UniProtKB/Swiss-Prot annotation:
Keywords: Cytoplasm, Heme biosynthesis, Iron, Lyase, Metal-binding, Porphyrin biosynthesis
Membership in a protein family: Belongs to the ferrochelatase family.
Protein name: Coproporphyrin III ferrochelatase
Organism: Streptococcus pneumoniae (strain Hungary19A-6)
Enzyme class: lyase
Gene3D superfamilies linked to this entry: 3.40.50.1400
GO BP term, pick one: heme biosynthetic process
Highest taxon listed in the record's lineage: Bacteria
Length: 364
């Protein structure tokens, strides 16, 4: 039986031009082209950081995993929002005769909002899939962050006052209503690293970053808002974007430009450990993740639904409008509506608020 590993990531523009960024942004918005001023802002951000190394780094990560596991698995690489696209790579895998595939998403934490965006593409009459849900607890990855933060504390902070700011990509606040495990995983991940470093609860905090402006509330505090709200600052901040493993725009701009600029304004020293990128400790974590999971059941993939079935709707949410295609809703919500029918999907309060904002609630 021919087996494969499919390593997947978010993607990035294929070329740093206005139209190249526009194409990528349109893919993120599910085929709806953003307004020109939105595209211009994102394009300017890419120019500010000199482009993005994400695709180069990811291909190097894939090659390093293949060097370790290539005798047992064919290793493939795909993006969610840029070439090579996941459906195209699955087509190539089918042509290569692959029958079983371990899906390794290059995001250590599991989120309905983001990870299910990968899962929806896993369709094949030939291939059975095994999706690794999360791998943030891998000891090698934890040790990477501990070692790199400790190095900054020892060599640069020394005896000065300091606070470690763990940040993670934010998610819409209605993820709380769905019981999304992502938020708790981020807190647990930060605590595990902090405990290994011997940090007290006053020496570190959790923030969120990189939220999208799609007209709905996101998990707070945003890292920039957190910095602005502090009445006193330490001598040093160490920013740890713990939900990412590779350098890309949400680290190189959101942290290294925006957070850095605020630190300059407040007279605080800015630090960020290098991202794992191609470090051997990250590769160890990825390889071990495959080893730990490879004997689990492979199956035709279907998105999980049981999380939603446990929700009890209030009277207010029972008559929400059936049509949702034009709303910026997570794909897993749309897919659930399509599969089970609008009348059978139990939506929590904040989903209702999304419909209200869009003026889509039916009249009483």
């Amino acid at each position: 039986m021919k087996k494969a590993i499919l390593m997947m990531t978010f993607g990035s523009p294929e070329e740093i031009t206005f139209e190249g960024v526009a194409d990528f942004f349109t893919n993120i918005r599910r085929g709806v082209r953003p307004q020109d001023h939105e595209i211009q802002t994102l394009y300017d951000n890419y120019v500010r950081i000199g482009g993005t190394p994400l695709q180069k780094i990811t291909r190097q990560e894939v090659a390093l995993v293949e060097a370790r596991l290539g005798n047992e698995y064919s290793v493939y690489f795909a993006n969610k929002f840029s070439s090579p696209f996941i459906p195209d790579v699955i087509g190539q895998m089918e042509a290569d005769g692959i029958e079983q595939c371990i899906c390794l998403i290059l995001e250590p934490h599991y989120s309905f909002y983001s990870v299910m965006g990968y899962e929806k593409f896993l369709e094949s009459k030939q291939i059975q899939f095994l999706v690794i849900k999360d791998w943030y607890q891998e000891e090698a990855l934890l040790n990477y962050w501990v070692d790199e933060i400790a190095k900054i504390l020892k060599e640069e902070v020394k005896q000065d006052s300091c606070k470690v700011i763990f940040s993670a990509h934010s998610v819409p606040i209605f993820a709380l209503d769905f019981g999304d495990p992502y938020i708790d995983q981020i807190f647990e991940n930060s605590k595990l690293v902090a405990e290994k470093l011997g940090l007290s609860s006053e020496q570190y905090t959790n923030t969120w970053q990189s939220e999208s402006d799609i007209g709905i509330p996101w998990i707070k505090p945003d890292v920039l808002e957190y910095l602005r709200e502090q009445t006193e600052h330490p001598d040093h901040y160490i920013f740890v974007p713990i939900s990412f493993i590779s350098e890309h725009i949400e680290v190189l701009f959101d942290n290294d430009v925006e957070c850095y600029d605020l630190c300059q304004e407040f007279g605080v020293n800015y630090h960020r450990p290098p991202m794992p990128n191609t470090d051997s400790r990250l590769i160890d974590a990825l390889v071990n993740t495959v080893r730990v999971n490879e004997n689990q059941e492979f199956k035709e993939f279907l998105p999980e639904e049981e999380t939603f079935d446990e929700l009890v709707p209030s009277d207010e949410t029972k008559n929400i409008l059936a049509e949702s295609e034009d709303l910026q809703m997570p794909e897993f919500v749309k897919k659930l509506i399509e599969k089970k029918g609008r009348e059978n999907v139990k939506m929590p309060y904040l989903i209702k608020k999304m419909f209200e904002k869009a003026g889509k609630l039916p009249k009483e």
